[in-house]
Amino acid sequence: MHQDRSAAGRRGGGAPALAVFGRPPSFDILAIRTVRLAAPVAMPLDLTVSAGELLESVDEASAEATVPGPVTGPPWAGVLPPRGGWRQVPGLPGPEVMGAAVAAAVAEFRARDEALPVQHRTRSERDRIGREIWSRTLGDTELPLRAVHAAQSLGFLRPVRAAVPAAAPAPLPGAPASAPVALLAAGTWLRLRTPYGSVAMRRPGVTGGLGALQVRPV
């Protein structure tokens, strides 16, 4: 929401947690944050709202927020990951290794960009290099580096504090607050879960990026 206040965000959930979905610019992933509700809501929430209005509705002092009016959302808002059926996938390296992989990828991109002849320093050529680098998978997993890059850019891979305040984002339902970083899979979806939030994306090779799976009314 801080990156693009004009964007739309999807809210969904009910007692005891509320999930907020967004699609950050430049990353073909969905960002997911969840918060525990202090009191149950009268009915489940499932609507698309303005990211800027949602941000302005949050009162940090009282830890309260109002629900903005619904807006017509982008196509991705009707293509959300499944709520259940997630299983942990082995092989994910630790946060330090993931951070080093992202740093190495960024350094490679800069070096290759600087090595381009002047006449080839075009947007299309830089995009081609970026796609080649960020589509590589992390270690022995199916997770593309761009998902790890997105998680790091969003602050999801920062060190876990010794004590997490009550107002900190809660994990998805069924996951403890101290849950370590993990790679999960459900159907054609992958999710990189951290104590601060998750990034989700369709598995590599699925047509259309986020694709057209589980279309729901918006």
Where do the language-model regions lie?
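N-terminal ordered "arm"
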Residues: 1-37
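Generic hydrophobic secondary-structure signal
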Residues: 18-20, 30-32, 42, 182-192
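Aromatic-enriched hydrophobic runs in primary sequence
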Residues: 19, 36-39, 50, 214-218
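Short, surface-exposed beta-strand-loop junctions and turns on beta-sheet-rich folds
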Residues: 24-29, 38, 198-200, 207-209
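A broadly used, surface-exposed interaction patch
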Residues: 31-66
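Long, compositionally biased intrinsically disordered terminal regions
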Residues: 65-218
